[in-house]
Amino acid sequence: MGRDTILEIINSIRNADRGRKRVVRITSTNITENFVKILFIEGFIENARKHREKNKYYFTLTLRHRRNSKRPYINILNLKRISRPGLRIYSNSQQIPLILGGIGIVILYTSRGIMTDREARLKGIGGELLCYIW
């Protein structure tokens, strides 16, 4: 049985966010590199650094948090995995869903790599819906 790297990334970030951790360490692959690049460009993470440790590459992600001592902690990352190994969900460019009226993003795996819903609509291509982020 293969690993679901997208689910590992989502769970690591979600668990760190809920546990009020500021830094997350994930293994580096081509898919995770593209996924992290999208999260950084869209402003969901503050910093991403790639480093090597014992012949393996890792990403160290710094999450954005809204912490205030007077108010309770607010989760800013809501991630939901859509397509999974047992049930792949595909969409063409016209039927890519809008998340919160365009505030959130959909990350797709297309024939031209991993991209956001906005990029896919502009290029007119569809693909596999990986996750929703809002």
From Swiss-Prot:
Keywords: Plastid, Ribonucleoprotein, Ribosomal protein, RNA-binding, rRNA-binding. It comes from the Eukaryota. It holds the Pfam family Ribosomal_S8. Its main location: plastid. It is found in: Plastid. One of its GO terms (molecular function) is rRNA binding. GO terms for biological process: translation. InterPro entries: Ribosomal_uS8 (IPR000630), Ribosomal_uS8_CS (IPR047863), Ribosomal_uS8_sf (IPR035987). GO terms for cellular component: plastid; ribonucleoprotein complex; ribosome. Belongs to the universal ribosomal protein uS8 family. Part of the 30S ribosomal subunit. One of the primary rRNA binding proteins, it binds directly to 16S rRNA central domain where it helps coordinate assembly of the platform of the 30S subunit. HAMAP family: Ribosomal_uS8_B. This is Small ribosomal subunit protein uS8c. It comes from Epifagus virginiana (Beechdrops).
